[in-house]
Amino acid sequence: MMPPSVSCRACSSACSSLQAIARDCVYSVSANPNTYSPSVSRTANVRFSFQTVRIRPNTRISPNLTRQSSRRAFHSTPTFSFERPSPSKISYRVAASSSGKGRRFHPIKNAYNFDPEVDALGVSKDKNPISRRRNRPDSGEDAFFVSRIGNRISDHQDNNAEAVAFGVADGVGGWTESRVDPADFSHGLCGYMAQTAQTWHEPAEHLRPKQLLQAGYDHVVADSTIRAGGSTASVGVALPDGRVELANLGDSGTVLVRRAAVHHYSVPQTHGFNTPYQLSVIPPRMRAQASVFGGAFLEDFPRDASVTNVQMQHGDVLIVATDGVFDNINNQDILKLITSRMIMTGAWTATDSGVMVSKNLRALTAPGGLVGALPTSSGAPLPQRDSTDSEPKPEDQVTLQSVLAATVAGEAKMASVDYRRDGPFAKEAQRYYPGDYYRGGKVDDICVVVVIAIDDGIAADQV
């Protein structure tokens, strides 16, 4: 992903976002499985004006470049220091949505709710590499994980009960030219980070996302089944007092939306256009060839990740996504999507004094919390879940957090195959290479994790 320009990433005020809500349609699921399916496959090229090399937009380049940071948009609220922990207890409702490049997107099938009783999401415990590949979620070269911190026999299980670790990783597609599957690295990295979080025996506040990223990377390097590859990563650790620490390496990123305004966004790290910071495993043979013929591989490390601390409040929505999202929609698009869905589902309410968090937030994030709002093929709403029914049902996956994740992923999917809509990648390509005519979206793998904060004290008073 490339760093979008300031003008294309600027977020408008909350008022302009609310005005756009009337033009947006509430998220709904079509019975047609082709709902976000691209009608045609697309291969676009970006040409360097000073070379004859043609570069596919989905293939990150790995030249020997001087490290240079780039910026993405701006804060709608001023940059602030890490706030004092909230005295109330915060719990987190987490869901993910993903779609592989060139594959159909199913809003319900491609949504995954995190259940802390299960411990982890997006992780395969199968030791057979072939079985692991077969059981991966439909995310292509992208990967995600969500895990509780610590197990149930830990000495700190009471203090760590609501602590959550989460993240996304985007495999570097350029490794396919060396006959390496980039998905092995990204999925392996997320799997090892989830295992590290699950087996954490100390207080959750002692686990930092950069430390988690380092542990996952060390395991990937030691894994003989992952012979080569690379990945970007965006990782977070959320504590029960609302403190969230985020570590971002590369062009995956985060956006925090608070009551119809962008409260925080991450800054992408790139060496140049379409060349993000990336963790890498480089075989000795390839290193030797590079030393003989000249040149060098890009090698960044977990210590290079940028770290940000935020304080989540009741009703906040945190989006963690790969560049398949940020290459096709900008912060303004994400803000309008989240605001419209939160208000139309009743999670936020618009009042004379501003946007407020609804009393129904906890119920909407429970299993099947939004099932009544989704139509069936006959047009009638799905029946509400019977509380006495212990068997899990597909409609239980329809929660507020899964709807938000699927909405962002679905919008990015549609924008990626739209020839007439210039996304952030297209605008940046036009700025870097004005002689080339790159238009439309960028077809890529897409992965989104959504985290909603619930203040247990406020939610209990409203029941």
Q: What are these model-derived regions, one by one?
A:
Residues 2-463:
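PP2C/PPM-type serine/threonine phosphatase catalytic domain
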